[in-house]
Amino acid sequence: ITAQRVPMTSVPETVALFNGCGGMSSLLVALGVALFPEAGGSDLVAVVSIVVSVFVGAITFTGSIVAMAKLQGWLSTPAWMQSRLRHAVNIALAVLSLVAAVKLIASGEGGQGLWLLVIGSGLLGVGVTLPIGGANMPVVISLLNSYSGVAAAAAGFVVGSQLLIVAGAMVGAAGLILTQVMCDGMNRSLVSVLFGGALGASSGGGGGGGEYT
């Protein structure tokens, strides 16, 4: 019903919202099993799957919400996010998420490491998506679609669902292929789309790829 009522001009925002819902679903499943290990097991495979599902799911959720808000005109890029400072912030968030993931795997149970991972990866999703301009946003939405599939596949390992693993892998692969095709159509690499804006703006190059809104 929602898809039928949405005008064609708002389809990208709708897809971003659906991606966010998928990422949040995988995140909640992983959190449930992490907080209540009897629901899915606490062996190494289960813990690693929880880490992947939480990390990718949180990035997908926050990144998709930011993408939708930017396309709707509800958000704009802060000035400091257009500089190299954003790379330092994102690296710090990635390191925080990595440390939290290692701590969670080492402990094998939910706790401080789990919530640090949720916060760090969620903020990382915002930090990566917020500086990207509207012209590149469809590529980001396609990549986030791939992420939602990866998160779903990881959640499938968490709960032991082969159907969820297969479906998530298919969505992840299809989204990644579509992302690469879109990048080829724009004659740009995925790295330049995600990280090249501030570098292009600071060096005076990039053929307009550094435009931010």
Regions found by a protein language model. Name each.
Residues 1, 20-35, 50-66, 181:
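Mid-bilayer segments of alpha-helical transmembrane spans in multi-pass integral membrane proteins
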Residues 170-213:
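Membrane-interfacial segments at transmembrane helix termini in multi-pass membrane proteins
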Residues 90-98:
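Core segments of transmembrane alpha-helices
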Residues 2-11, 27-43, 107-108:
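Transmembrane alpha-helix boundary signature
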Residues 9-22, 79-91, 138-147:
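Cytoplasmic-side transmembrane-helix entry/capping segments in multi-pass membrane proteins
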Residues 117-129, 139-185:
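Membrane-embedded transport cores of multi-pass solute transporters
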Residues 46-60, 164-174:
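Alpha-helical transmembrane segments
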Residues 1-14, 64-79, 124-137, 179-183:
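C-terminal ends of transmembrane helices
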